[in-house]
Amino acid sequence: VKSAKPDVTVLALVGTDHHPFDRMVNLVDELLAGHDPSDGALSCLIQFGTAQAPSSAQGRDFLAKDEVKEHIDRADLVLCHGGPSTIVEILRSGKMPLVMPRDPERGEHVDGHQQRFARHMAGLGLIQLVDSVQQVRAEVEQFTAGADERLNPGIELPSPAESALRLGRIVDRLTAAAPAQRWWRRGGRRR
């Protein structure tokens, strides 16, 4: 007797940037539209920001920080933009983020920092880069097949407070080592 496939909850986060990220909204809608119910139930919540509202998925334009954390903890899979803060929050939850970085060539951001950061994190094995509904569908299928151990990178990150203290110590060392120079003249003009 074959056991029923588990229900899967996907959370998608476009972040708070003012550029619309319709590509992610469309991907999530396409994922739901193409889902076979015999593969188990699939529910998706997308925080869509300034993008168009989803037509198939449940959507909220913005979520408070505590709501984001709650939804990340409840979700089986989390798809997100390439923002470092969001990625780290998902990693802290013990999940491997499925990351679809915003593309400035498509008007989704001002520069390519999300793409560069996401490639770096993928190279470290900490995230899974995705760019198509087929890739996300494959992640859902792997999860329902029980291959979810791959989705937890098993890393421990310092708390935000500990990270801030570490950064403060680094800044203190750098400023202590810098020569005492005056880079400006009185009146605010550079020489």
What role is predicted for each listed range?
Residues 68-110:
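A donor-sugar binding/catalytic signature common to diverse glycosyltransferases
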Residues 24, 111-117, 149-151:
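Class I S-adenosyl-L-methionine-dependent methyltransferase catalytic core
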Residues 19, 62-70, 81, 108, ...:
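Residues at secondary-structure transition points
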Residues 59-63, 127-136:
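Short acidic-hydrophobic, aromatic-tinged amphipathic segments that line or gate anion-handling sites
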Residues 1-74:
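Donor-nucleotide binding loops and adjacent catalytic segments primarily
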Residues 42, 138, 142-191:
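C-terminal amphipathic helix plus adjacent low-complexity
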Residues 66-67, 86, 135-139:
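Short acidic active-site motifs
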Residues 96-131:
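Catalytic binding pocket for nucleotide-activated donors in carbohydrate/polymer assembly enzymes
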